[in-house]
Regions:
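Core subunits and conserved enzymes of cellular information-processing
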Residues: 1-133
Length: 133
């Protein structure tokens, strides 16, 4: 999941919205990203921010930040991969949809044939490593 190229293909699109009873947090999005990776997603984006192996998803003063970029509800999560695997993993007994729909969060999911996810458009910075060897 380096995210260095634009990709397109089949997959799923989820829309998540806060409501008066439940606010979506970085933990919700991290669980969703992990479930999608487990299901074999080849590319993932949240509100058009490409998810890579280096992506940070954190809460800062009740605001979700992805790699230092503020995002807000509604959240659109796109995942490219085998639709059957993605859908069945998210709908499994302990999957994201079953777990979080019970909390009152508004979630919809659709299977789509032609999803486009743009490449990661920022510089990848390594703290301890170097690509100049």
């Amino acid at each position: 999941m380096h995210g260095l190229t634009n990709v397109e293909g089949e997959g799923v699109v989820l829309k998540l919205e806060d409501n008066e009873e439940q606010q979506i947090t970085s933990n919700h999005l991290l669980k969703l990203v992990n479930d999608l990776k487990y299901a074999g997603a080849e590319a993932i984006s949240i509100n058009e921010n490409r998810i890579t192996n280096f992506t940070d998803i954190v809460d800062v003063n009740y605001v979700i930040m992805i790699n230092g970029i503020k995002i807000s509800s509604p959240y659109e999560v796109k995942a490219i991969g085998n639709q059957t695997y993605l859908s069945s993993t998210l709908n499994a007994k302990d999957g994201f949809l079953k777990t979080y729909k019970e909390t009152g969060v508004t979630i919809t999911m659709s299977e789509e044939k032609n999803i486009k996810i743009l490449k990661y458009n920022r510089e990848l910075k390594l703290k301890y490593g170097s690509s100049n060897y």
